Amino acid sequence: MEFTQQNANTNTIISVDESSITISNSILSRPCFVSTNNASEVSIKNLGEIGKEFLFTLVGKDPIDLLIIGTGNSPKFLSPKQQIELSEFGIGVECMNNSSACSSFNLLLGDLRKVGLLLL
């Protein structure tokens, strides 16, 4: 899938495929985390591994108001326990398929929102 919107000062998503993501002239293997000014590959492999400790390491680098989690070709959702844990950070969390997650990330980034994307 190709995306065209791009801002030189942020990590805009250019394209994404089954194993990688291209952002502003960089390529990352999935799974990865992308925010306005930071991007890194992560060791987490599935939704069940997401918790407070994992989120703390991500948002410490670049504060965000919303975390979008791309869960693959079909949407999967956090457990109620995970939702409660993550709500303690005061960050909104949305889970959706990767295509929707990438589109939403670029849209919110264009609106100057503090958004992060975790692509599994």
Task: Walk through the language-model features, giving the residues of each.
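Non-catalytic interface/targeting segments
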Residues: 1-52, 110-119
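Short active-site-adjacent helix-start/loop capping segments
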Residues: 42, 75-78, 103-104
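A short, acidic, amphipathic alpha-helical segment used as a generic capping/interface helix at domain edges
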Residues: 50-60
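Mid-chain, well-packed structural core segment of small domains
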Residues: 58-94
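Conserved phosphate-binding catalytic cores of ATP/NTP-utilizing and phosphoryl-transfer enzymes
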Residues: 102-111
